[in-house]
Amino acid sequence: SGVGRYSFPHSMEYSYLALKDVVVGEGVYQWSVLDGLLADAAGRGNQLVFRLYLDYPDCCAAGGGYETAVPDYLLSPPSPVTFTPYSEYGGGQSPDYGNQRLVDAMTGAIAAMGARYDGDSRIAFIMVGLLGYWGEWHTYPNTAQMAPQATQLAVWQAYDSAFATTRVVVSSDQLDQWQ
C-alpha cells in the first residue's frame, strides 16, 4: 500500500483522491477522506501532496476491475455524464469532460477545497488533476477523450482562484499547451 515506516528521510507523502469521495451531491462536500489523509501524514510529521482524479485506469472497484470517480449524482438525469471505454493501461472509461454538470462539479469542488484548505500547513502542495488518466491531463493514446480546452481552462482558473497561499503544481507538459 506504500504506507509505513521507512528509513529513507522524507517529509512528504502522496495520495490520489477520488472526486466522488469529496463531492457527494450538487454543492455538497464531504471532507472526511481528505481530513484523514492530512491527519495521518501530519501524525507522522509529514506534509501531504495530493491529486484529485475522475478516471483511474484499472482501478478501484471492490474485488478488482474499474470504478469511475465521477460523483454518483452526476450519473443520473438531467444530463448524466456519459463515458467512452478504453483498453489501455488495464482499461477504464473516460467521462465526457465537456458535460457542464461535471465541469460545475469540478470547479465547485476546487473552490470549496480552496475555501477550506488554502494555507493549511499540512499540505505541501496540490497537484492540478481531475482531467485525463490518473488526473494527469492526458489520455494518450486516446487523445480525442481528453477534456476540451474550455474545460481545461475552467479547471485551471478554478485552481488559480481558489489557492492564494497553498502551492498548486502542474507538470511542464501541461503548461506547454497554454504558452
Over which residues does each language-model region extend?
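Conserved, mostly hydrophobic/aromatic
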Residues: 13, 41, 113, 126, ...
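Solvent-exposed N-terminal domain segments of exported/luminal and surface proteins
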Residues: 1, 178-179
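Short, surface-exposed basic-aromatic patches at helix termini and helix-loop junctions that form
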Residues: 35-43, 118, 159-163
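Well-ordered, non-membrane alpha-helical segments in soluble/globular domains
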Residues: 27-37, 103-112, 145-158
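Aromatic-lined carbohydrate-recognition surfaces of secreted/lumenal glycan-active proteins
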Residues: 122-134, 153-178
